[in-house]
Amino acid sequence: NEESLFSGR
């Protein structure tokens, strides 16, 4: 989901 994209760690 989008949260995963924002936290590219």
Curated annotation (Swiss-Prot):
Main location: secreted
Compartment(s) of residence: Secreted
Entry PTM: Conversion of fibrinogen to fibrin is triggered by thrombin, which cleaves fibrinopeptides A and B from alpha and beta chains, and thus exposes the N-terminal polymerization sites responsible for the formation of the soft clot.
GO BP term, example: innate immune response
GO cellular component: extracellular region
Keywords: Adaptive immunity, Blood coagulation, Coiled coil, Disulfide bond, Hemostasis, Immunity, Innate immunity, Secreted
Function of the molecule: Cleaved by the protease thrombin to yield monomers which, together with fibrinogen alpha (FGA) and fibrinogen gamma (FGG), polymerize to form an insoluble fibrin matrix. Fibrin has a major function in hemostasis as one of the primary components of blood clots. In addition, functions during the early stages of wound repair to stabilize the lesion and guide cell migration during re-epithelialization. Was originally thought to be essential for platelet aggregation, based on in vitro studies using anticoagulated blood.
Note on domains (UniProt): A long coiled coil structure formed by 3 polypeptide chains connects the central nodule to the C-terminal domains (distal nodules). The long C-terminal ends of the alpha chains fold back, contributing a fourth strand to the coiled coil structure.
Subunit text: Heterohexamer; disulfide linked. Contains 2 sets of 3 non-identical chains (alpha, beta and gamma). The 2 heterotrimers are in head to head conformation with the N-termini in a small central domain.
Protein name: Fibrinogen beta chain
Gene: FGB
